[in-house]
């Protein structure tokens, strides 16, 4: 248990907070009305909460379309004419938070609130570093929100490289991000770099190169 006086996030959730979320909807046949309804219902039920972790979301998307566990609805990767497509959509940059940045104390010296990569100040069993820093060159002794973003960006870059090497077609979309904001511009660049090359379109700025499958959606 944490030391007496350690602050916790306020709200109605108890120790099981975030552990009772709705399971991911598996691949669903949308060639029939029932399948379409199932997907739309799942989308309508989604609610945003907490920080932004793009690599975690993309990783689960990859798992859903794969033919292996924990999801088994995907066709075999070796099947001809079978494209594995993952669409990565986000409205912000990767974020991970120190307790103090959210108004909490950190008497347990966890260095971050608990999220998908665990605590930033605790080594996960079997790892030489806290999981958020594992397999990156990012400093594992800089416990700041900005450094956590760098670590997540590094995780995202590695994931994108591995996904495309495995044959996934990666489409990326940012929502209302601004190139004039340095943090948002960095996320836009990361998303563009993650996206696959178009098989048909050319880069409007250089016709010798394929266009990237990245879009920044703007407007209300």
What are these regions (language model features)?
Residues 1-220:
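P/S/T/G-enriched low-complexity
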């Amino acid at each position: 248990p944490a030391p007496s006086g350690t602050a916790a996030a306020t709200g109605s959730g108890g120790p099981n907070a975030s552990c009772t979320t709705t399971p991911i909807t598996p691949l669903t046949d949308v060639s029939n009305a029932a399948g379409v309804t199932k997907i739309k219902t799942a989308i309508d039920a989604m609610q945003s909460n907490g920080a932004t972790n793009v690599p975690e979301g993309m990783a689960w998307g990859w798992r859903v379309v794969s033919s292996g566990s924990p999801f088994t609805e995907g066709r075999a990767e070796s099947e001809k004419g079978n494209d594995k497509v993952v669409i990565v959509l986000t409205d912000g940059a990767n974020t991970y938070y120190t307790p103090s940045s959210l108004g909490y104390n950190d008497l347990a010296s966890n260095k971050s609130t608990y999220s998908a990569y665990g605590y930033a100040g605790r080594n996960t069993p079997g790892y030489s570093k806290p999981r958020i820093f594992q397999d990156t060159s990012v400093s594992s002794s800089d416990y700041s929100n900005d450094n956590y973003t760098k670590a997540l960006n590094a995780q995202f870059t590695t994931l994108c490289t591995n996904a495309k090497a495995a044959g996934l077609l990666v489409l990326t979309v940012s929502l209302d991000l601004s190139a004039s904001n340095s943090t948002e511009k960095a996320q836009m660049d990361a998303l563009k770099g993650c996206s696959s090359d178009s098989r048909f379109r050319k880069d409007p700025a250089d016709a010798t190169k394929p266009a990237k499958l990245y879009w920044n959606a703007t407007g209300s």
